[in-house]
Amino acid sequence: MFLSLLILLSYALGFVFCVVCLACGLYYFSELVEEHATVAKRWIKYTMWFVMGIIFLLGIFEDLDFTSLLFSFIGHCCYYTLLTEFPFVTLTGYKFILSVLSFIISHISWFIYFRNTENWYPFGEIIAIFTFCVWLIPLIFFISLAANDNSLPMANSYSSHSNSNIIGVDSEFTKKKSRISVLKSMFAWAKEKTSDITGQKSMKHYY
């Protein structure tokens, strides 16, 4: 009995450790993307072509649902339109909304197809299809895209008010500098909320 509890505890600790490592890796990757946006944009474009080629080859050589493959291909066409403004994105823009809708539709389509008992596939093949045809590009965009600071939990009303009073080239530069990656904003927001709950604030003294 006691050994069974230790096994469950070890699984829980292993899961937490993996989640923390994954979060740290994603945060580091978002830092790299922010510093090298042009290179990141080029690699995302090549990765998108690679995934679209995989979808095309799956439609030729594998007996998969044509509708699900078509939804995945259309979804990646929608993702491709986001590259025109990379690494910035407007969360209320039609490009972003269409991309989110296409991701949801593609995910549901594949889920319904694999849920059908007549379409039995090994678990590894299902994960491979979801990884490349559904999850890969949206995950890359999630950790690399930047959003307007007004649409994130860490929004600063003062900075946005100050930016609105500046015109010309400096205004555009200030707007871009005030945008931070979505993932970094989420980490900062989570850190602030954790500090509020625990009552622990970082105290820095300058002499």
UniProtKB/Swiss-Prot annotation:
Annotated membrane topology: Multi-pass membrane protein
Source species, domain of life: Eukaryota
Any one GO biological process: endoplasmic reticulum to Golgi vesicle-mediated transport
Gene Ontology CC: COPII-coated ER to Golgi transport vesicle; endoplasmic reticulum membrane; Golgi membrane
Keyword Transport: no
Keyword Ligase annotated: no
Annotated keywords: Membrane, Transmembrane, Transmembrane helix
One of the record's GO molecular function terms: COPII receptor activity
Localization: Membrane
Transmembrane segments annotated in the record for this chain: 2-22, 54-74, 94-114, 126-146
Family in the record: Belongs to the SVP26 family.
Name recorded for this polypeptide: Protein TEX261 homolog
Organism classification: Eukaryota, Amoebozoa, Evosea, Eumycetozoa, Dictyostelia
